[in-house]
């Protein structure tokens, strides 16, 4: 945390999202105000990441160092990227669900400069997907995105 402050804060935070809605290894149940810390990874997160370890869950670390949700929220801009059907429920909760520690990514609903980039497969459970597409297609030029 001190190193982040000494560097002037975080300008751009680029995130993925887990199938259970975790971001930055802040698993479900993480405090929405949490700071950078060592975390124990859930079995689901370890299963999701086994592909990077020869599909061997036993080779996946059980702990990690992560920025907390409060730390992430202090970033000036946040971009979250999600692709594929396996992320559809998490994206639905992130965008349309209530803010809850059970779906840590939902805290991003309160970020003033958060952008969510998803493909059609990840968008498949969004109830307002057509509205989101329409508003993006007709956004004012001054928005610059």
Protein language model annotation of sequence segments:
Residues 1-145:
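Conserved phosphate- and dinucleotide-binding cores of soluble alpha/beta proteins
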